[in-house]
A protein has these predicted regions:
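A short, active-site helix/loop in glycosyltransferases that binds the activated sugar's phosphate group
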Residues: 1-2
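Hydrophobic/aromatic beta-strand patches that form the interior of the parallel beta-sheet core
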Residues: 5, 27, 72, 93, ...
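Short, acidic/turn-prone active-site loops that include or flank metal/cofactor-
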Residues: 9-11, 97-101, 133-137
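Short, surface-exposed amphipathic charged segments that create phosphate/polyanion-binding patches used
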Residues: 17-28, 108-114, 166-170
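Catalytic binding pocket for nucleotide-activated donors in carbohydrate/polymer assembly enzymes
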Residues: 85-88, 116-181
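C-terminal alpha-helical cap of glycosyltransferases
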Residues: 181-198
């Protein structure tokens, strides 16, 4: 809904203040899996589930790094909470929620299966690339919605590599009509709340 984009979210005010940084990385943002999170909560040794969940993303990160791109992995805070050592040992730089805004404004593109991090990236000037290595049916709806506002859909990791190359070379750019215009989301939301108060 364009009205939501125009109003903004309070956290976007901070994101806006960071815009204009030099872009030097590709952010991979797989969505979290609540079943994996619950399993880790019950059994901290169930890190094999994390390995299975992140394997295609780590393979993509390795390929992009080999192609000369600085790659950063978004690690969902709920998963990091249960297995911090696993994420520290990845060999790929990983960020959680706290460092995410700085990473977004420095990223050329955000690659995601369906994480809201892709939305945040697109309003921060990143090109959105939708790729689901598990090919879940509901990702098609997510992909279609995001392609309608300028994201790139990718069916294979090779297509992700091609899209990243196009973005870094400047052949594909982020849609300008999605960029944050100001840091006034808090003020707008407060005004709307005051208007509707009884």
């Amino acid at each position: 809904d364009r009205e939501v984009w125009r109003t903004g979210f309070p956290r976007h005010d901070h994101l806006h203040s960071l815009l204009g940084r030099e872009r030097d990385s590709i952010l991979l943002a797989p969505t979290w899996d609540p079943e994996v999170s619950r399993a880790l909560e019950c059994d901290p040794d169930a890190v094999g589930l994390l390995s299975a969940l992140y394997r295609p993303w780590l393979e993509l990160a390795a390929g992009l790094t080999q192609a000369g791109h600085r790659t950063v992995l978004f690690a969902h805070p709920k998963l990091v909470l249960h297995a911090p050592e696993w994420f520290r040992a990845l060999g790929v730089p990983a960020v959680t929620g706290h460092d995410l805004p700085e990473t977004l404004v420095r990223s050329w593109a955000v690659v995601s299966d369906r994480s809201s991090v892709l939305d945040e990236g697109m309003i921060a000037g990143c090109v959105g690339i939708v790729w689901d290595p598990r090919g879940r049916p509901d990702t098609d709806r997510y992909r279609a919605r995001h392609e309608a506002i300028g994201a790139i859909g990718a069916d294979t990791s090779a297509q992700v590599h091609q899209a990243v190359g196009d973005v870094v070379a400047g052949r594909v750019t982020a849609p300008e009509d999605l960029l944050l215009l100001d840091a006034g989301a808090c003020a707008r939301l407060t005004a709307l709340l005051r208007r509707d108060m009884i």
